Regions:
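Membrane-cytosol interface at the C-terminal ends of specific transmembrane alpha-helices
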Residues: 132-199
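Non-cytoplasmic
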Residues: 195-259
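Alpha-helical transmembrane segments of multi-pass membrane proteins
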Residues: 67-72, 76, 105-109, 159, ...
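Short amphipathic alpha-helical coupling elements at transmembrane boundaries
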Residues: 64-68, 99-109, 122, 156, ...
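Hydrophobic alpha-helical transmembrane segments in multi-pass membrane proteins
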Residues: 72-80, 84, 114-118, 186, ...
Length: 360
């Protein structure tokens, strides 16, 4: 006779699959299906001799257009986050790089977003040769509306870290990789989440220009809410414009409720103030996730990956930035650095002058 499972264990096993698990499971399946469905549009080839400006404007196409726009926004947000981590960390941890990277970032921030489309459109179109190039152009335009603000926020958080946290990282002999994920990112999380939310909101305004692109006198319109609104405006259909605006409002509210609101509530645990905030943000969706095994499942899957990355990044050394700096050695290094920058600038100016003379 086989050994029977205790009643308490059987009940705990039954409780593992709850209504929250079912809801989150259906949500994940729907998300994967939506990404797959939207990704099918990347197989459509676009040539300079054709025009894709005539998108169907029936109301039945609005869910598909909304999914396309959402996917572009989140892909751009992912690239913006990766750029923020790399660029801001380099500027905050390398003093000489900071003298170049921060002014360059300030210049990029002052360039109008639509100005990037003038030279990136042809570049991406020739690089990929089909609709992927147009998608890359659109995503890059949205990226420029998000990345600069997020990078400045992360850079400011890194340069204003409390000294006791730096001493704790030295005491525990964290590697540079470990310090980044266990100290730098958590201590900057609140500001990064809020700036990502603001940057995401600003990106919605540029969808119309980013999804409708002109190349060699031809108009190429990618499926999305921005292009739908642009076509409806050209057709003079105020009803379609109004419906599209309502759909976009629903999209913005939904993204806030399902994505940013949970992130804001979750990021509160990284707050380092002595006095707790009186009105802590709450999220129904975050509470729903906490009642499931989804977070535990993600942890089980990613923990081996994290351990592997810890091992392969150990050769980069410990995060022990020098406390005392030799001023004479620093001045010699600065002198050599600026000579190198001058040589690069002179080389670039000379090549630019040669190209202009050739065109003349």
């Amino acid at each position: 006779m086989g050994r029977r499972t205790p009643i308490s264990n059987r009940l705990s096993i039954r409780r593992r699959v709850s209504a929250a698990d079912v809801v989150v499971g259906f949500g994940v399946v729907a998300l994967l299906y939506g990404i797959t469905r939207v990704g099918e549009s990347l197989s459509v080839n676009v040539t300079p001799g054709s025009s894709t400006a005539r998108l169907p404007t029936g109301l039945s196409h609005l869910p598909y257009y909304a999914a396309c726009s959402l996917l572009r926004m989140f892909v751009a947000l992912g690239f913006s986050t990766a750029f923020t981590f790399i660029y801001a960390t380099a500027a905050a941890r390398m003093r000489r790089a900071e003298m170049v990277l921060i002014p360059v970032l300030d210049i990029l921030q002052s360039v109008p977003i639509l100005g990037f489309l003038t030279f990136t459109t042809i570049f991406f179109f020739r690089l990929f040769g089909n609709v992927v190039g147009l998608e890359a152009t659109c995503i890059f335009a949205v990226f420029t509306s998000q990345a600069w603000n997020m990078t400045f926020s992360f850079y400011h958080s890194l340069t204003t870290q409390p000294r006791d946290l730096d001493e704790a990282a030295r005491l525990y002999r964290l590697t540079k990789w470990q310090r980044f994920w266990k100290l730098d990112v958590p201590s900057s999380m609140i500001g990064l989440v809020w700036n990502a939310m603001m940057s995401m909101g600003g990106g919605w305004f540029f969808l119309t220009a980013a999804e409708a692109i002109t190349i060699s006198g031809r108009n190429y319109t990618l499926p999305g809410m921005g292009s739908y609104i642009g076509i409806a405006i050209r057709q003079g259909s105020l009803a379609k414009v109004g419906i599209a605006v309502v759909v976009m409002i629903i999209m913005v509210v939904g993204v806030n409720a399902v994505f940013f609101r949970p992130l804001v509530a979750w990021a509160e645990k990284f707050r380092m103030e002595d006095s707790a905030s009186g009105d802590k943000p709450k999220s129904f969706f975050l509470n729903l996730l906490r009642r499931t095994d989804f977070a535990r499942f993600i942890g089980v899957v990613t923990k081996p990956i994290g351990r592997f990355l810890d091992r392969i990044t150990r050769p980069f050394g410990l995060a022990e930035y020098p406390l005392a700096i030799d001023k004479h050695r620093q001045r010699r290094g600065d002198f050599a650095f600026w000579i190198l920058i001058g040589v690069v600038v002179a080389w670039g100016a000379n090549n630019g002058l040669d190209l202009s003379l050739i065109h003349i």
